UniProtKB/Swiss-Prot annotation:
Name of the protein this chain belongs to: Iron-sulfur cluster assembly protein CyaY
Keywords: Iron, Metal-binding
GO terms, molecular function: ferric iron binding; ferrous iron binding
Biological processes, Gene Ontology terms: iron-sulfur cluster assembly
Gene: cyaY
Family to which the UniProt record says this protein belongs: Belongs to the frataxin family.
PANTHER family named among the record's database cross-references: FRATAXIN (PTHR16821), FRATAXIN, MITOCHONDRIAL (PTHR16821:SF2)
Record organism: Shigella flexneri serotype 5b (strain 8401)
Amino acid sequence: MNDSEFHRLADQLWLTIEERLDDRDGDSDIDCEINGGVLTITFENGSKIIINRQEPLHQVWLATKQGGSHFDLKGDEWICDRSGETFWDLLEQAATQQAGETVSFR
């Protein structure tokens, strides 16, 4: 994967997250902001999830209250380089915990 393809795929990931949050019908207020390649999800209780791209490594990094994870693209899924879990699984787990209600991105 070259840098432009990486950025295209990361942009697509950001857009999907933003669209899912805009379309959700939950009780809690969840905001999403993109600034300089960093996506910040802010929850009603003030907690945050930070997602950023690491261009030199072609990775997506996820930082939550539970810790940080690094993801490599394998096939059509972003996979954690430590646990083998998918980006969507870990993001949903963290968002659900931080929101205090089920949050789905799929």
